[in-house]
Amino acid sequence: DSKSAVQVLTPVIFKEDRSSYDIVKKVWKDSIVNEKNFERKWEKILHEGIYTKPLLSSQKVRTQNKISTAVLNKDQTLDDNKFEIIFTPSSSVYDGRYANNGWLQEIPKPITSLTWDNAAFVSMKVAKKLNIKNGQMIEISLGNASVKVPAWIVPGQNQKTITLELGYGREFSGRIGSGVGFNVYPLRTSSNMGYAMNADIKTLNETYPLASTQEHYGLEEDKLAAPGFSDLSTNEVQSRIPDLVKQSTLEKYKKHPEFVQDIVEEHKPDKSRSWADHSMYNPEPEYDYSKGHQWGMSIDLTSCTSCNACSIACQSENNIPVVGKQQVMNGREMHWIRIDNYFSGDPDNPEVSTQSVACVHCELAPCEQVCPVGATTHSTDGVNQMTYNRCLGTRYCANNCPYKVRKFNFYNYTRDLPEVVQMAMNPDVSMRFRGVMEKCTYCYQRVSEARIKADNENRDLVDGDIKVACAQSCPADAIKFGDINDPNSEVSKAKRRNRDYALLGQLGTSPRTTYLAKIRNQNPKLSSNNHQGAHH
């Protein structure tokens, strides 16, 4: 019979041996239920399994502003040519506790789209004044401490504030997290846990490569260069941003609820003529998409917070590999879902719009028309599917995809994975190999699982049987997935709303994934009316 540590130490402390029951009872009597009639209360606690402390009597409290006044009277003066430092936990690795997680290291951060590193966020005005470029090393000094960290120019950053992300630069984090990023904790003391005043900034004559996905897979026709707005307010950009992220204010939406249809004309293709008529192959039989289960998705841009939960859930569900910083810098990240960031208006106080983009499963998919081996085809239930062992890696499909959502395996990223890591992979999803194209599949393995379960139970599929990974993980419930032929499904209800629109609808691809336009409910005193220039 073994004994717990408490039972072993009890004879030493109390000079007598006690049972576990007596030890627990004594602790409750002395420390928790220090009341009269303990034996009766003890029996009640054992019977009910819960103990409710008696309510405290109400007390009159007089507020004293001594502490708050002392804080407010603390020296808050910001000297000229000095900066305020803001310490913030990383949106990816928090305070460093998740630094050894490759998924979180490689996920692009909101607004900056940085991966695998932290940086000092500076404003455009400061960057111009100090001649700072993205990735240029700067030295931040505060008191007797100083750190060297690369700079990153962020629209909307206060010109007197430098933001530093915590959680990086750990030396013993693990195989993935050790040595990633820069340790800024030396500047953070017990007296300035959240922010610090009067820091000095010194520009260094050295640079550090930062991996940002901001300019990857952009939907604009022109290659736009971050970080400034100086040359970005072109007619081309201004005309395309409202088409991609359709939005309005609540006040304008109430007056004109059909505003989505006025922004750009959506072309409805003539489905009586099939693209297969012009193919060198025998045309496949036409499918009647008005019958049977037809899968579709709706994404509400008003609800979406660009938190990246959908992208991480997709990576976990579909065995998407981590490729590393260098491959991200080469534009070869493998995420099936990306978050596009758009900035408009005043660079010092821009309006930020975000959009979650994955394969939209076009009914008339441009990718299917150019594949020489038929590796990407359409299913009878409206899903654009990939046959991996048929793919030759020509990448014609990626070139012809207007949404830029297809990802190519330049290497066999999973070949050298240890067996124990392979056991953590989803067995319902195929592992891809070098030379193969991949993309969102609408979590078809979950569709098949739900269909098999319904067949075994001798019933039809009902709305809610299928939860794709992105919709399941979305904390804002911004993603709806289901049968668009079911008028009572959540996705059908969403698509009937007057805010529904198709991304790049003017191309006539009939995407199954559509969006609900973003509605802003801004305080009129805080909103800006000058949101003309635009930048991705």
Predicted feature locations:
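Short hydrophobic beta-strand motif reused across regulatory alpha/beta modules
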Residues: 310, 376-377, 397, 406, ...
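Iron-sulfur (Fe-S) cluster-binding segments and ferredoxin-like electron-carrier domains
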Residues: 313-324, 408-410, 478-489
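Non-catalytic, well-ordered alpha-helical segments in soluble enzyme domains
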Residues: 3-29
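Ferredoxin-like iron-sulfur electron-transfer modules
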Residues: 276-306, 338-366, 372-396, 410-468
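Detector for the c-type heme attachment site
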Residues: 310, 315-320, 359, 372, ...
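Long, compositionally biased charged/polar accessory segments in the mid-to-C-terminal portions
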Residues: 435-536
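A cross-kingdom feature strongest in bacterial/archaeal respiratory oxidoreductases
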Residues: 1, 30-335
